[in-house]
A protein has these predicted regions:
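Conserved G1/Walker A P-loop phosphate-binding module
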Residues: 1-59, 63
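Conserved Switch II/interswitch segment of TRAFAC-class P-loop GTPases
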Residues: 59-64, 73-97, 101-125, 534
Length: 635
């Protein structure tokens, strides 16, 4: 169990831990000279013989060091709120309590300290103050223990309360990747660099490779301590010290706020969707795009908050919001965060991360807001997935979901209605019903294209995607088309897509001109006439021949030079025969085989290069065996 202190300056937090554990805090010279805690202190103790070690994090109480307090409050299991009997509830008591409640720390104990300085009536007054303070929140029933670090009064009662809490604390799940928010980094003679922090998820073992810091530098775990004891592995919920090694690893490159992560989780982000709450004691509403300090893990970064459901947020209210940060952070769903004002002098509120990879567009669309509300109300991936899919026309990236929830895909239990669609850029998740619903409109739009362009065989894939106005990314759209082609709902002729029964209808003028020109091309063999030599308006002939090329009946080798499809196939067969004799084909060999001049032969070969039949190697050619033309041509 990890216990963190909280409370106003000079209320006796450090002295209380010393009385409880027998270990001195405030080990830094400056802290001893000034008589107050400035940075985080760490203690470990057995609260009774043979008990598990309990870790204690002693935080500073002065408002100037609240940023240090926030770094220590992340990941603790129980907060020990200390209120001095002589002072009573003070400003930092309020702020620290607000912070630990916003962080969602599950348990609290309250120590009314310095009881040796006051009478019992004063202790009772402070008890009532504390009860009033705690009443609206999650710690309303927290035990209150009056004690004195000087006389020892109440220390044993506190010890027993902590032991009972330790027995009841739930072990954090070790599922998911390892995450450590670094709060200290130092060098040990003979060992090297050591970093410490609370393991927030997963587990780590000696020999593991992790990614460190903003650059994601690979480091190896040479050794580790868990709860201040040498160990071979450590688990989520434990205080961990890791001895790291890596090439050119320098202490000055590691700072509080850096993360140590399993490789699969490394995904820095500067845009996060959150469920935000403004503290009820705030004097004014929070405005859209207001600048803030954001404390997440042990990081302290600046940015702005874009409110997603209104122009302002009233004190005590909640709202969906998007963080736009100036520095990359690491986060997963459910991570708590604290928001402080631009000057870092006052805590404004906090929230929970919903999506660490928030979109840049459509962030306020009804579909996106529905997804975010589902994330607020659902704890697990399986719970929220149906709502996420129901409000997504473009599918969900399973790799991104695995990072968002810190859940390896092997642990997912997908609903029956979920389909995994393979695309050229990786798999996507769709609800089966929504995926099927995307098909009918596409077929209907293709039919509409045929009505508008009856003299065309059909559009290619990209033109059809533009024509339909599809919001699907190109790889996903192609996967949808592939299914329609496989099912026979759509057919293809070369690159052109069409309905199975579609027949091109030329206009009467085009039909008459084609009947006149077609014999000329067939009779010309490998040396067809140029457009200018066909005896008709060049623009009209050119438009018709390009139309016939889209139908697959002609091939435009160069501008104004077209070959019939059967001639291209004969030329392909001759090229394949040459390749049988020698896989590397010389221009001269092809020229001699077809009986044309060198210039025309090169024009034909360059056309074959463009359509993927051949690969150019200087002035030679090699057949691409995966070419559809090569595979479907007999020779």
């Amino acid at each position: 169990m990890i216990v963190g202190t909280a409370g106003h300056i000079d209320h006796g937090k450090t002295a209380l831990l010393q009385a409880l554990t027998g270990q001195a805090g405030d080990r830094r010279r400056e802290e001893r000279e000034r008589g107050m805690t400035i940075d985080l202190g760490y203690l470990y103790a057995e609260l009774e013989a043979d008990a598990q070690l309990t870790g204690f994090i002693d935080v500073p109480g002065h408002e100037r060091f609240t940023h240090n307090m926030l770094a220590g409050a992340q990941g603790i299991d129980l907060v020990l709120l200390v209120v001095a009997a002589d002072d009573g509830v003070m400003p930092q008591t309020h702020e620290h309590l607000a912070i630990v409640q916003l962080l969602g720390i599950p348990r609290a104990l309250v120590a009314i300290s310095k009881c040796d300085r006051v009478d019992s009536a004063r202790v009772q007054i402070v008890r009532e103050q504390v009860r009033t303070l705690l009443a609206p929140g999650a710690y309303a029933d927290a035990p209150l223990i009056a004690l004195s670090s000087v006389t020892g009064e109440g220390i044993e009662t506190l010890r027993q309360e902590l032991l009972q809490a330790q027995r009841e604390v739930q072990q954090r799940s070790t599922e998911g990747g390892f995450r450590l928010a670094i709060d200290r980094a130092f060098s040990v003679a003979g060992a090297g660099i050591v970093v410490t922090g609370t393991a927030l998820s997963g587990q780590v073992a000696v020999g593991d490779t992790l990614l460190l810091g903003p650059q994601g530098k690979p480091v190896r775990v040479r050794g580790l301590h868990a709860q201040n004891q040498a160990a071979g592995h450590a688990l989520a919920g434990q205080r961990v010290a890791l001895n790291l090694s890596a090439e050119r690893l320098a202490l000055e490159h590691i700072h509080r706020g850096h993360w140590l992560l399993a490789a699969d989780l490394y995904a820095p982000t500067q845009r996060l969707d959150i469920d935000m709450q403004l503290l009820p004691g705030e004097p004014r509403a929070f405005e859209h795009f207001q600048p803030v300090h954001v404390h997440l893990g042990t990081q302290d970064v600046t940015g702005r908050v874009a409110l997603l459901e209104g122009a302002s947020l009233a004190p005590g209210e909640r709202m969906l919001a998007q963080l736009l940060l100036n520095t990359p952070v690491h986060a997963v769903k459910g991570d708590p965060l604290i928001l402080r004002d631009q000057s870092a002098q006052r805590t404004l509120g906090g929230g929970r991360v919903l999506d660490p990879f928030a979109p840049t567009r459509q962030r306020r669309s009804p579909e996106r807001l529905a997804q975010l509300h589902a994330l607020v109300n659902s704890a697990t991936l399986e719970d929220v997935l149906p709502a996420l899919l129901a409000n997504s026309d473009t599918g969900l990236d399973p790799q991104r979901l695995a990072r968002q929830f810190n859940r390896p895909r092997s642990s997912w239990v997908l609903p029956a209605d979920v389909r995994l669609i393979d695309t050229r850029q990786g798999p996507l998740l769709f609800s089966a019903s929504r995926w099927e619903a995307l098909k009918s409109p596409l077929v209907e739009q293709l039919a509409r294209f045929h009505e508008l362009e009856p003299d065309q065989m059909g559009p290619d894939r990209d033109r059809l995607r533009r024509f339909t106005g599809s919001t699907l990314e190109r790889p996903t759209f192609i996967s949808l088309l592939d299914e329609l082609l496989a099912s026979g709902d759509i057919a293809s002729s070369g690159p052109w897509l069409h309905l199975p029964g579609h027949q091109v209808r030329l206009s009467e003028e085009d039909e008459a001109l084609w009947l006149e020109l077609q014999p000329l091309f067939e009779q010309a063999g490998f040396d067809p006439p140029w457009v200018r030599n066909l005896g008709h308006d060049e623009a009209t002939v050119r438009a018709l021949l390009r139309k016939m090329a889209r139908l697959g009946l002609m091939h435009q080798v160069v501008r104004d030079l077209f070959y019939p499809d059967n001639m291209i196939r004969r030329l392909t067969a001759m090229l394949l025969q040459l390749a049988d004799a020698n896989p590397v084909i010389q221009v001269a060999a092809f020229r001699d085989a077809v009986g044309l001049g060198r210039k025309r032969s090169i024009q034909i070969l360059e056309y074959f290069d463009r359509i993927g039949l051949t690969r150019r190697l200087g002035d030679r050619r090699q057949i691409r065996l995966d070419s559809a033309l090569a595979q479907h041509t007999e020779h």
